[in-house]
Swiss-Prot record:
The gene is sho1. It is a multi-pass membrane protein. GO terms for biological process: regulation of actin filament polymerization. Keywords: Cell membrane, Membrane, SH3 domain, Stress response, Transmembrane, Transmembrane helix. This is High osmolarity signaling protein sho1. InterPro entries: SH3-like_dom_sf (IPR036028), SH3_domain (IPR001452), Sho1_SH3 (IPR035522). Residues 146-182, 201-220 have a biased composition (Polar residues). The chain crosses the membrane at residues 15-35, 45-65, 75-95, 104-124. PANTHER family: FCH AND DOUBLE SH3 DOMAINS PROTEIN, HIGH OSMOLARITY SIGNALING PROTEIN SHO1. Residues 1-14, 66-74, 125-282 are cytoplasmic. It comes from Talaromyces marneffei (strain ATCC 18224 / CBS 334.59 / QM 7333) (Penicillium marneffei). The keyword Cell membrane applies. GO terms for cellular component: plasma membrane. Forms homooligomers.
Length: 282
């Protein structure tokens, strides 16, 4: 699981509001249950609902803080559905009682049920759902946010595999590129990316045309040990022949899962690099 960070909760208004309300509602139901249990007979079943819901709330805090809601969304929806049944039955057992402590506990469970319904609608929907996209747009850090919005405007070559200063950029033959080749080793930038003339002079220089020395050519990986599934559709940048397009739900073979760009191969044999935040490992 990814590292837990409180900024994922504090930077997400939806998560911060719903988690805060759920904790408050649970405290009301818990304290009301304790008082009611001291004053009069109290249904033991309600304690199970109290214990179950604190576990569910804790799980949602962990998943939200680690930004893995896409990975565990189905499991969360299942647990929340069971929790909705438990809280509803607890309300039915308490709300009609004359004791104010039981009614207070019932009010806490009613508020919990309302939050659970909202959570089910959120976690049970796909990331492409309009309401979820709207909610996620307010979050500062969110898994699966559009890569196009986070792509650097100046130069993004530094994060791609095989394009650092210390090693030659990744090369492809004409047969591998299927007619998408360009005359520049760095696609879209004749003579290299902007500012390349100011880089370390010890870096390898590449010709802008003609024959390229085969010793500088980086061979494509022969093994693709990982399987990944596309959670979004992606259209390759037409100015970069190294990228590949794929559709949502398509399964790809991946050779390396380090970095923001993964070397991938489609079912039709097409190879190239794909943004990692558009894929999920199987």
């Amino acid at each position: 699981m990814a590292r837990f960070s409180t900024s994922n909760i504090l930077g997400d208004p939806f998560a911060l509001a719903t988690i805060s309300i759920s904790i408050l509602a649970w405290l009301i139901s818990f304290i009301g249950s304790i008082i009611a249990n001291v004053q009069t007979d109290f249904p033991n079943y309600v304690w199970w609902a109290v214990a179950y819901m604190i576990c569910v709330i804790t799980g949602i805090i962990i998943v939200t803080g680690s930004d893995t809601s896409l990975t565990y969304g189905n499991a969360i929806t299942g647990y929340l559905s069971a929790g909705l049944v438990f809280t509803t039955l607890a309300v039915n057992s308490l709300v009609y009682q004359p004791q104010s402590s039981k009614q207070a506990a019932a009010a806490g469970f009613i508020l919990l049920s309302m939050v659970i319904i909202i959570w089910i609608f959120y976690f049970g929907s796909t990331p492409q759902a309009s309401h979820r996209r709207t909610i996620d747009s307010f979050a500062l850090n969110k898994e699966g946010k559009s890569y196009q919005n986070s792509r650097p405007q100046s130069n993004g070559f530094g994060t791609r595999p095989g394009t650092t200063v210390s090693q030659p950029p990744q090369m492809y033959t004409s047969a591998q590129l299927n007619g998408f080749e360009t005359s520049s080793p760095m696609s879209g930038y004749p003579g290299g990316p902007p500012g390349s003339d100011k880089r370390n002079t010890t870096a390898t220089n590449f010709p802008t045309g003609g024959n390229v020395d085969s010793s500088n050519e980086v061979s494509q990986p022969t093994e693709y040990p990982y399987k990944a599934k596309a959670i979004y559709s992606y259209d390759a940048n037409p100015d970069d022949a190294n990228e590949i397009s794929f559709a949502k739900g398509e399964e790809l073979e991946v050779s390396d899962v380090s970095g923001r760009w993964w070397q991938a191969r489609r079912a039709n044999g097409e190879t190239g690099i794909a943004p990692s935040n558009y894929l999920i490992l199987l």
